[in-house]
A protein has these predicted regions:
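Domain-level signature for soluble enzymes in the chorismate/prephenate branch of the shikimate pathway
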Residues: 1-96
Length: 96
């Protein structure tokens, strides 16, 4: 078996993956920033902080928009994780 770390094609794919991962991270951080602003506004207005129907709508919308190769089941799992992480982060920042 050869050393894949010296293979330029492997390195090129890895660099593309890293760039994509950074873009995903930036998008998630942007999402959290926007959700924080929304939660602050909702608090000022006396609205409920969480809207489960909106979360369900978003998941279904993203599944309809999904062109693959990620399965719709995985879209739902991934988005539930992102929503949960966002809510935990917003709660953590509120407590700070």
């Amino acid at each position: 078996m050869s050393d894949q770390s010296s293979d330029p094609i492997v390195e090129q794919f890895r660099n593309q993956i890293t760039d994509t991962d950074l873009a995903i991270l930036e998008a998630i951080n942007k999402r959290i920033t926007t959700v924080r602003k929304l939660h602050a506004y909702k608090a000022e207005q006396g609205y409920d902080a969480v809207d489960p129907s909106r979360e369900e709508w978003l998941t279904q919308y993203l599944q309809r928009c999904n062109k693959g190769p990620l399965s719709n089941d995985e879209v739902a799992i991934l988005w539930r994780s992102i929503i949960d992480s966002t809510l935990r982060e917003v709660a953590r920042l509120r407590e700070a």
